From Swiss-Prot:
Comp. bias regions, Pro residues: 169-179
Feature: compositional bias, Low complexity: 231-240, 298-312, 336-391, 399-423, 721-734, 788-808, 839-854, 942-987, 1019-1059, 1082-1105
Organism for this UniProt entry: Dictyostelium discoideum (Social amoeba)
UniProt lineage: Eukaryota, Amoebozoa, Evosea, Eumycetozoa, Dictyostelia
Bias (Polar residues): 613-625, 988-998, 1005-1015
Region annotation (Disordered) ranges: 164-193, 224-245, 294-316, 332-427, 613-648, 683-703, 717-740, 772-819, 838-874, 942-1106
UniProt-recorded name of the protein: Putative uncharacterized protein DDB_G0290989
């Protein structure tokens, strides 16, 4: 750290500001490709004191401490105030090629007091371009050097010869006075002196550039140079004390030896120029003075002065940078100490040969000096062969006591470098390797810094200091303008600094402060949480643009400008992103997967922007064990690297295979999608063809209507055969039973809700159809005319009350489709009411020869009359309910539903509907949701119905169905089989593959009531049923029964048509009705008893929140019927789906948490 006394105390003045601009613009190197000019200086304080304007873009970096740029126009003045005590000056240049007004700002110096700087048009409207800058930033080091030399800036520069970071502090200039335009030269001598100084500076800069251009671009030798410096530094420390004893012996030969070693050093430079910049300058001066025949004693004095200056500068070197270098050197030294002992001994013997060869090349040296020089070097070599101490001292802090030792060390340095480079075949990647490679190759990619290390008990401290340096690793924080503003105002969890730690953390409170000499920032984290701990694991090679440890925003400059032109004030542009495509290819070729600390999963740009960093599996609480694990992993790092070198080839192969597989999968998916689209198109074409065929059939049916009517009239007159009479009686019995079933449902449509809400059919719930909402079927013939080769069965709950029969005279039936029993899951559907609208389709698999006999003249007549009665409904389909004008209100939901039906062509009339498997094209529940649905928190005991009652009722129904079917004629044996199959064990066959014409595949795959996977109902235990259905459900029958309790008087057409041949059938129906009414009364009593016994058990379930859906249904006859469906909100969620003709309520069961 720099002491307060040694820090430059510069008070900025207007003249200093002007002078700095002029000196930068007067630099020698000029580039025509860039039209950039210096604009102004910024004075910056701490981050908390920084206020960012709204229309600015932030540029972040550590090598260039960059401020938000301010867009300035002509005749505009901007005053920037930073109240912090610690401030620094930054200057920038304006790039005219970038139309957004991008301003890159560089750190200049540190100030002790705050300062207000006025920016005027004089500084903006500068026609001369800024010299020393180029697109690829090759002359950026020149710019920084000029700042250091002219403005006494405390900047870090990278010495390419030794690959070390050096703090160069030239002698400070006299402090400018605070008032502007006071120091102005009046005499011509002063002006001439100033011009001479400028010329000298320009010459020195040109020499440095020429020397830098001749340097080779070496990446693999970075770590070797560090090791060699460390070894030589240790040797110097051991040999200093012994060298002091030899000073008297060497005094008379010092001058000649200085010349020898300098020439040997020059000879090594011709082979591989890696001298520091100061030594290169001294060597150039030495060559000039030799040509002028100057004495070597003056050269010695000049060299001593330069060494003293270097020692002073090394004192001011940043302590933090020293610690970093020491850690790196210690780590490298431990790994290579044993391997380099033998090569070092061989290398130390080589300097004996060079001094012998040098005097022959130099005519100035005398042959008498050679035998004296040899024993001195032998003694020094013996001293250097002693074991080196573990502690390594920085080469910049060494006190060079003797020039002979320094020269010998230089020779040893060069020899060691050559031998080590020849002996070492493997590249070891250490912290900071990428930065060294980038800087040694003059890459414009500047690091943003990373955390150095954390002590073991650092998490126990309240404040953890994390140092960001420019020679460790990378950290990229992608933020927006709003997040920066929030961070500066609130200091809350805005950024996620997980990249710093090698693990994912969340910083809750932090502050960022610059160090005393502004060479680094200190990130003080007050609160943080370790979300995840990362462990070392090899990962596949990835390009630098996608690697999580390296900057992710690597764009070409052209692309960056195009993107930034549309997003002024919102984007954040980094100076690191200005990289060419060629340099990007070089970076991609580096082995980035061998970094010391790694993140197992790659982070995309979206993850960085959104902060989605919780992608790893294991979690951590920030205990000290984590840091112990890190130390153990660092010990095993050498073994890791060796293993990874062998695995890299395999990993590359695996990576290529993975890419090929991924590409093949993508192609397969594309092919599959195309095939699906083709199939869908074919299906649509087939459907269109079927519709056209149906329309043609309807037209043919209408043309043949008159012929059929004439035939039926003739058949009515022919009653000669007794067989026809028997068939008529049998058919009448079946038809009356069918009418009776339909009319039973017509008697009270509420019963189907009660039956479906309960846990009926011994644990199986039938997905029933409330056809009251949609269909009107007056007779079997009308129904069979509507459905082609199909009939639908009903699952209804009926009541023998006269009130229900009178009120529901306009509603005829509800239908339910039946298909395979295999498709029915247990707990199929519980407690929710819904409707299924069946469309035409299907086939009769159980047709008998008796079916032709079942078609009587009366049936044909009735089918004719039904056709004429429903001519308006022929062209409509059964695919959806037409929804008209929903009325939202605070009252229960009311909707008006109009029904439509179709009358496709009939090929033959099936004898038994249960043998049919109709195809379902759509279903829907389409009530209107109110804006504020009414919730019923409690229900009375009368509103509850026991599950056991429903089960008992259905069991009784199953028994009645079997007995009644057995009482039918023997020629209907197939009907008995079908009935037994359907109601055996109270398991009806139900079509569960319902699909809607408007629904998508995603809806069918979800947990909507569209398939086999239907949710379980809480009503098994809750038993929430509407109170209107409490008594009505007690007298129930199901399909396939000959129950006559629901016959209406509206079937006069049917009775009148059968007046000749169906009198006996009506008598039988009345008798059967009386018997069934008796059985229903008995069942009523049993059910009432069960209700009384179980009502007490239902008291605990009365407080469930229930959403009541109310429907207002309109049948084809114009009768309105209201119905309410209760749904438990605690277990179900209701949503609506807009569809053609209305919308649909989708009820989903909530998952148990």
């Amino acid at each position: 750290m720099m002491d307060n006394q040694s820090k430059p105390s510069i008070i900025p003045s207007y003249e200093w500001y002007e002078r700095s601009i002029n000196r930068v613009e007067d630099s020698s190197s000029s580039i025509n490709n860039v039209s950039s000019k210096l604009v102004f200086f910024f004075i910056i304080g701490e981050m908390k004191d920084l206020k960012i304007p709204q229309n600015t873009r932030l540029l972040l970096s550590t090598k260039h401490y960059i401020l938000p740029m301010i867009h300035l126009e002509d005749k505009q003045k901007e005053t920037i105030n930073f109240p912090s005590k610690k401030v620094r000056i930054i200057f920038g240049y304006f790039n005219n090629s970038n139309k957004e007004g991008e301003i890159t700002l560089f750190l200049d110096t540190e100030l002790e007091k705050s300062h207000n700087l006025n920016i005027t048009n004089k500084h903006i409207n500068n026609d001369q371009p800024l010299k020393g800058l180029s697109k690829n930033f090759n002359s950026l080091s020149l710019l920084l050097q000029s700042l250091q030399r002219n403005y006494n800036a405390s900047l870090l520069t990278f010495d390419k010869s030794t690959n070390t970071t050096i703090k160069q502090l030239p002698p400070p200039l006299p402090q400018p006075q605070p008032q502007p335009h006071q120091q102005q030269p009046h005499n011509k001598k002063q002006i001439d002196d100033i011009e001479l100084k400028k010329k000298k500076e320009i010459e020195e800069i040109d020499e440095i550039e020429d020397f830098e251009s001749t340097q080779p671009l070496v990446v693999d030798e970075v770590d070797d140079n560090y090791d060699d410096i460390d070894n030589n530094n240790n040797n110097n420390n051991n040999s200093n004390n012994d060298d002091d004893k030899l000073e008297d012996i060497e005094e008379h030969n010092e001058e000649e030896e200085d010349q020898i070693h300098l020439f040997t050093h020059a000879h090594s430079l011709t082979q591989k120029p890696q001298l520091p910049k100061k030594q290169q300058q001294s060597f150039d001066e030495f060559q000039r003075k030799i040509k002028d025949n100057k004495s070597p004693q003056k050269l010695k004095l000049q060299q001593q002065q330069q060494q003293q200056q270097q020692q002073k500068q090394s004192k001011h070197f940043d302590a933090f940078e020293e610690e970093l270098l020491e850690q790196q050197k210690i780590h490298e030294h431990k790994l290579q100490q044993q391997q380099q002992i033998k090569p070092q001994k061989q290398q130390l013997q080589q300097p004996q040969q060079q001094p012998q060869q040098q005097p022959q090349q130099q005519p100035q040296q005398q042959p008498q000096q050679q035998p004296q020089q040899q024993p001195q070097q032998q003694q020094k070599q013996q001293q250097k062969q002693q074991p080196t101490p573990k502690k390594i001292i920085n080469s910049l802090q060494l006190n060079n006591v003797n020039n002979n030792n320094n020269n010998n060390n230089n020779n040893n340095n060069n020899n060691n470098n050559n031998n080590n480079n020849n002996n070492k075949n493997k590249k070891e990647i250490m912290p900071g390797w990428l930065e060294k490679a980038i800087l040694s190759n003059s890459f414009p990619l500047n690091p943003c810094g990373q955390i150095v290390s954390l002590p073991e008990d650092s998490h126990k401290k309240k404040n953890i200091s994390l140092y960001l340096s420019d020679n460790i690793c990378y950290i990229q924080i992608i933020v927006s303008e709003n997040t920066v503003r929030e961070a500066l105002e609130n200091k809350k969890n805005v950024f996620n600094f997980g990249f710093l730690f090698g693990c994912v953390i969340e910083i809750l409170d932090y502050t960022i402060k610059p160090d005393q000499d502004f060479s680094k920032f200190v990130l003080n984290i007050n609160k943080f949480v370790i979300l995840n701990k990362n462990k070392h694991s090899p990962i596949s090679p990835t390009p630098i643009s996608k690697h999580p440890r390296v900057i992710s925003l690597l764009r070409i400059k052209k692309d960056m400008n195009k993107n930034a032109s549309n997003n002024i004030g919102n984007n954040i542009i980094y100076s690191e992103s200005l990289i060419s495509s060629d340099q990007l290819e070089i970076l991609n070729s580096l082995e980035l997967w061998n970094l010391p600390t790694q993140i197992t999963k790659q982070l995309s740009l979206q993850d960085l922007t959104e902060g989605n960093l919780s992608m790893l599996d294991s979690t951590n609480d920030g205990s000290s064990q984590e840091y112990e694990e890190e130390e153990e992993e660092e010990k095993n790092q050498k073994n890791f690297e060796k293993e990874e070198e062998g695995e890299n080839i395999q990993m590359r192969q695996l990576y290529e295979k993975y890419r090929e597989e991924h590409q093949s999968q993508v192609k397969k998916q594309q092919i599959i999608q195309k095939l699906k689209q083709q199939q869908q198109q074919q299906q649509q074409q087939q459907q269109e063809k079927e519709k056209q065929q149906q329309e043609k059939q309807q037209d043919e049916e209408m043309s043949d209507f008159e012929n059929i009517q004439n035939l039926m009239e003739e058949v009515q007159k022919s009653d000669d055969n007794n067989n026809n009479n028997d068939n008529n009686n049998n058919n009448n019995n079946n038809q009356t039973s069918k009418r009776k079933r339909l009319n039973e449902f017509e008697s009270d449509p509420d019963d189907i809700y009660d039956l479906l809400e309960s846990n009926t059919f011994a644990g199986h719930q039938v997905k029933g159809v409330d056809e009251n909402k949609k269909l009107r079927v007056d007779s079997e013939d009308q129904q069979t005319k509507k459905l082609t080769t199909t009939t639908t069965t009903t699952t209804t709950t009926t009541n023998t009350n006269n009130n229900n029969n009178n009120n529901n005279s306009g509603i005829d039936s509800g239908t339910k489709t039946i298909e395979d029993d295999n498709q029915l899951d247990e707990d199929f559907f519980d407690g929710l009411n819904y409707s299924i609208i069946a469309s035409s389709g299907g086939s009769n698999n159980n047709n008998n020869n008796d079916q032709n006999d079942s078609i009587t003249t009366k049936e044909k007549e009735r089918s004719e009359t039904i056709k004429t009665h429903n001519e308006d409904e022929k062209k409509n389909s059964l695919s959806f309910i037409k929804f008209e004008n929903p009325i939202p209100s605070n009252n229960p939901i009311t909707t008006t539903v109009t029904t439509t039906s179709a009358s496709p062509k009939i090929t033959e009339i099936p004898k038994q509907p249960y043998a049919i498997k109709p195809s379902i094209s759509s279903y829907s529940i389409r009530p209107t949701l109110p804006t504020k649905p009414s919730l019923i928190k409690s229900l009375n005991n009368n509103n509850n119905n026991n599950n056991n009652n429903n089960i008992n009722n259905i069991n009784n129904i199953g028994n009645k169905n079997t007995t009644v079917n057995n009482s039918n004629h023997s020629n209907h044996s197939n009907n008995n089989i079908n009935n037994n199959n359907i109601f055996k064990n109270s398991n009806p066959i139900v079509d569960t593959n319902f699909s809607s014409t408007t629904k998508t595949d995603e809806a069918q795959q979800s947990k909507i009531f569209t398939g086999n996977q239907l949710p379980k109902s809480p009503i098994n235990n809750e038993n929430v049923v509407n109170n209107n259905n409490n008594n009505e459900i007690n007298n129930t029958t199901t399909t396939t029964t000959n129950n006559n309790s629901g016959i209406h008087k509206n079937n006069n057409n049917y009775n009148s048509d059968n007046s000749d041949n169906s009198d006996d059938g009506l008598k039988q129906e009345k008798e059967e009705q009386k018997e069934e009414q008796k059985e229903n009364k008995n069942n009523n009593n049993n059910n009432n008893n069960n209700n009384n016994n179980n009502n007490n058990n239902n008291n605990n379930n009365n407080n469930n929140e229930v959403l009541n859906f109310s429907f207002s249904l309109t049948s084809s006859s114009g009768t309105n019927v209201k119905k309410t469906i209760p749904i438990l909100l605690a277990d179900y969620s209701c949503t609506s789906v807009i569809q053609e003709g209305g919308f649909e309520i989708i009820v989903k069961r909530k998952e148990n948490k």
